[in-house]
């Protein structure tokens, strides 16, 4: 036997053995019999062509769960596929002059080879890529079923346009006013778009997310905030007589506009008496109509459009307004309020119009100060703030900022002295009595715009006919495949410039028609892939596997992929595609931390890769030049900062088990982990320690162990503790048990061979979730049957987990003076006698008068002295 473990030889050997044995293929429901099922899934990767250490950590965590479940007797489904559509492939095609499909499939092959080196327990029999026609053909069929159900519609809408990627972005894909992929400043354009009615499920999505007890609280909160349920008042402000002339000049349907007034939604009807102006969104229908023949308002709207589209950008932007000259009547006082167009009002929330109460909303306050509008306080604070000058005077002129806290109502006629909640209810009731409005529930969530003006995506399966309108592609004609002969020379969508593909006959009337040239947002592809892994078309098998029992992925997907997947599953349920009453796709969710690394800059200010620098104590230099290197922050590994570590190089140097061990051991899995060379070297040394321990075992399997030795107790406790730690996603705690266990085995070198063999056998069976290749080699070394990756988790002997003795502290007048170890079932009198005889306690009590001794069984001994 080799004196040193060689990971390169062992890992290649065992990966081949697993493949030959088809060890990780899930059993069919019929073959599984009474086995419980466990569907373990990590968010499938985009095939960029290279794995990074973040991938290694994510998939290693999923593998820990999958291997542990298999060892516990579960029928495990642990599949892998590829999220292959999207703009990066299309951009790569343009840059490299290759077809996006060729580029994607080449990358898939390269990454699949990398996955194999990691020793993951994946069921590759269910592999697919979302760019496979079979996959997106099924997606097209789902689209048509959603369409039949009324969950799909088309409308002209203001969209977020990415001028670099030449496509529409969903609100969630706009980050700080920029495209989430390109980083370009997003523009607003009006286009005809396809939408999914996700808002039909808003209430259900909100209510049910709080019931997902095995999801992180942070993710549940993020989804709840994104859905954004708010209760308030929707009411109509009627036009003042002074508005008649302006409306006659600028609006086409005067009667309609006059009768509707200005509809607003507010969550603060208690502040109605503090209203001093009305604000319309720049995209409000009335604003657009007024701007049609008003150059100044048109210019103002254009200026507003330059501000980013996100709420954060609008919040930070200087407040701007345009006085329309229109006025409305206050419903309670009859006074007139001016109507402005304001850049901080969002058309996508409520009605796109608000009443402004500057005294109690900071945006309104800033706007009122800028345009010299009244500020009327109507909420009186309590406590220290009650002595503010504006409270005493009741005048907004004395306010330095809006008061947004709680208090009681002032300056509000019939609501004075009421609490905010009581005032809200009474104000709503009064408005309803006047016939001007009613209590309403509103959602921040908007319908999902799914049209994208790109080639490399799932074609939308409809045909536009001049006579028949929108016609679904017949199911028999699916999939509508992407043409390969496309050109990326013209800007925009190549499908639009491909007449041979675009021009077709209408399937309804036979006349000339055109295909829809938009493709689906790629978040569609990942919104149902978990159901495809469960089964291609067998509803019973799909029902058996769903929901996913444990999903693993990044928290950055909280309000994108995870919300869309929850909607999709509900829609699939409602069209008969999944038998999942709850509509929840993921029973358990774990969001892992990132892998981070120091950043390095050369003397010339260029980013350097970790492999380009040398460290000698605190001194870091560039290997090529010998010049000092600036060591920067420890941040997420990034290609742009070059602080990445190539998993292939790590595996070639240390082996996959070392890489897995390190990314799982250094910190709790939900936290970020810093990759360090010294940490990897330490993990590699531990691999050799484990192997050396097995190397020292007898060559023949000894008799069964007996008795309650220290080593047996340590082994059975460690196996039980690791079992619990893995169940609770405390992988670093499970790994800590390994170190303790190995030390116990070293201390137990003098114990009988049977006890040492039992310890080694148990350790080998606990090792596969973390270091599967080493585990197989160790298992073979001690003559274990079959593959240890298929072996059962060791069952701990409960009698060995029970402590025979306990340690009790001894206090004298409330201060600890010693401790004593006694049998668990020792009588109180005997415990007292043993405690009194403890040398340190006995010495302390010498010459003192003992008043009382209190023994709390199993807990503590209290001695009271005079």
Region locations from a protein language model:
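N-terminal catalytic cores of NTP/NDP-binding nucleotidyl/phosphoryl-transfer enzymes
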Residues: 29-98, 127-142, 266-267, 331-367, ...
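Helix-rich, typically C-terminal accessory recognition domains appended to large enzymatic cores
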Residues: 83, 144, 148-161, 439-468, ...
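Residue patterns forming the tRNA-binding/recognition surfaces of aminoacyl-tRNA synthetases
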Residues: 4, 13, 17-21, 95-262, ...
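Catalytic alpha/beta core of large soluble enzyme barrels
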Residues: 62, 75, 284-382, 402
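Amphipathic alpha-helical
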Residues: 10, 15, 199-229, 281-322, ...
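Long, charged, mostly alpha-helical binding arms that flank functional sites
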Residues: 2-5, 230-234, 380-383, 391-393, ...
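Conserved oxyanion/phosphate-binding beta-strand-loop segments in alpha/beta enzyme cores
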Residues: 1-41, 70-79, 101-113, 214, ...
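Basic, alpha-helical terminal appendages of large translation-related enzymes
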Residues: 1-35, 269, 281-284, 294-295, ...
């Amino acid at each position: 036997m080799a004196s040193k473990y060689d990971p390169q030889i062992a890992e290649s050997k065992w990966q081949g053995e697993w493949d030959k044995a088809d060890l990780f293929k899930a059993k069919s429901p019929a073959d599984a019999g009474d086995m419980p099922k466990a569907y373990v899934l990590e968010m499938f990767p985009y095939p960029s062509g290279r794995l990074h250490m973040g991938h290694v950590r994510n998939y290693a965590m999923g593998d820990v769960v999958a291997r542990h479940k298999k060892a516990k007797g579960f029928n495990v489904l642990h599949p892998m596929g590829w999220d292959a559509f999207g703009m990066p492939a299309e951009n790569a095609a343009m840059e490299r002059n290759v077809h996006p499909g060729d580029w994607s499939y080449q990358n898939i092959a390269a990454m699949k080879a990398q996955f194999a080196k990691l020793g993951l327990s994946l069921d590759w029999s269910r592999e697919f890529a979302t760019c496979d026609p079979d996959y997106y053909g099924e997606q097209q069929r789902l689209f048509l079923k959603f369409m039949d159900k009324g969950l799909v519609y088309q409308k002209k809408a203001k969209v977020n346009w990415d001028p670099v990627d030449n496509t529409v972005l969903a609100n969630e894909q706009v980050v700080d006013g920029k495209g989430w992929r390109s980083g370009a400043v997003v523009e607003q354009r009006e286009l005809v778009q396809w939408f999914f009615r996700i808002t039909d499920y808003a209430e259900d999505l909100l209510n049910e997310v709080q019931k997902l007890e095995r999801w992180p609280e942070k993710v549940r909160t993020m989804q709840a905030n994104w859905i954004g349920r708010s209760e308030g008042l929707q009411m109509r402000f009627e036009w003042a007589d002074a508005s008649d002339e302006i409306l006659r000049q600028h609006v086409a349907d005067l009667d309609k506009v006059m009768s509707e007034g200005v509809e607003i939604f507010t969550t603060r009807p208690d502040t109605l008496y503090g209203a001093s102006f009305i604000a319309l969104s720049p995209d409000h229908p009335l604003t657009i109509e007024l701007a049609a023949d008003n150059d100044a308002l048109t210019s103002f709207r254009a200026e507003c459009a330059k501000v980013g589209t996100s709420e954060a950008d609008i919040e930070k932007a200087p407040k701007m307004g345009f006085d329309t000259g229109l006025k409305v009547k206050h419903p309670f006082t009859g006074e007139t309020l001016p109507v402005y167009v304001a850049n901080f009002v969002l058309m996508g929330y409520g009605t796109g119009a608000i009443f402004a109460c500057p005294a109690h909303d900071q945006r309104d306050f800033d706007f009122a100060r800028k345009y010299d509008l009244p500020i009327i306080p109507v909420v009186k604070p309590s406590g220290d703030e009650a002595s503010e000058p504006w409270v005493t005077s009741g005048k907004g002129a004395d306010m330095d900022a809006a008061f947004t806290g709680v208090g009681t109502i002032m300056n509000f006629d019939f609501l004075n002295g009421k609490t905010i909640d009581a005032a809200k209810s009474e104000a709503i009731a009064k408005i309803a009595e006047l016939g001007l409005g009613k209590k309403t529930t509103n959602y921040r969530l908007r319908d999902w715009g799914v049209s994208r003006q790109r080639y490399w995506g799932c074609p939308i399966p409809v045909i536009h006919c001049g006579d028949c309108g929108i016609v679904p592609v017949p199911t028999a004609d699916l999939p509508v495949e992407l043409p390969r002969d496309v050109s990326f020379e013209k800007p925009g969508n190549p499908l639009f410039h491909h007449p041979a593909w675009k021009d077709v006959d209408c399937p309804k009337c036979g006349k000339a028609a055109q295909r829809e040239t938009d493709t689906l947002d790629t978040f569609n592809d990942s919104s149902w892939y978990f159901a495809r892994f469960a089964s291609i078309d067998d509803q019973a098998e799909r029902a058996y596997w769903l929901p996913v029992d444990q999903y693993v992925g990044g928290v950055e997907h909280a309000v994108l992929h995870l919300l869309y997947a929850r909607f999709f599953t509900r829609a699939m349920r409602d069209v008969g595609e999944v038998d999942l009453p709850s509509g929840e796709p993921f029973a358990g969710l774990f969001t892992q931390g990132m892998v981070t690394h120091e950043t390095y800059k050369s003397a010339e200010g260029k980013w350097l890769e970790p492999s380009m620098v040398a460290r000698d104590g605190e001194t870091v230099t560039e290997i090529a030049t010998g010049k000092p290197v600036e060591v920067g922050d420890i941040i997420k590994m990034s290609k742009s900062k070059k602080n990445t570590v190539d998993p292939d190089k790590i595996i070639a140097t240390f082996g996959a088990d070392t890489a897995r061990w390190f990314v799982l051991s250094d910190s709790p899995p939900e936290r970020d982990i810093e990759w360090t060379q010294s940490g990897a070297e330490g993990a590699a040394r531990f691999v050799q320690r484990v192997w050396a321990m097995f190397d020292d075992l007898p060559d023949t399997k000894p008799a069964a162990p007996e008795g309650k030795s220290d080593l047996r107790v340590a082994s059975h406790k460690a196996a039980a503790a690791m079992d619990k730690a893995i169940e609770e996603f405390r992988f670093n705690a499970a790994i800590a048990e390994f170190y303790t266990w190995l030390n116990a085995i070293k201390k137990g070198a003098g114990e009988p061979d049977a006890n040492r063999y039992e310890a080694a056998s148990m350790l080998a069976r606990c090792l596969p979730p973390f270091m599967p290749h080493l585990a197989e080699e160790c298992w073979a070394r001690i003559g274990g049957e079959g593959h240890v990756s298929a072996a059962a988790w060791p069952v701990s002997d409960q009698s060995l987990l029970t402590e025979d003795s306990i340690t009790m502290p001894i206090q004298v007048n409330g201060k600890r003076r010693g401790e004593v170890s006694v049998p668990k079932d020792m009588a109180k009198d005997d415990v007292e006698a043993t405690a009194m005889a403890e040398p340190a306690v006995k010495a302390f009590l010498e010459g003192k008068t003992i008043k009382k001794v209190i023994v709390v069984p199993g807990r503590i001994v209290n001695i009271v002295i005079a």
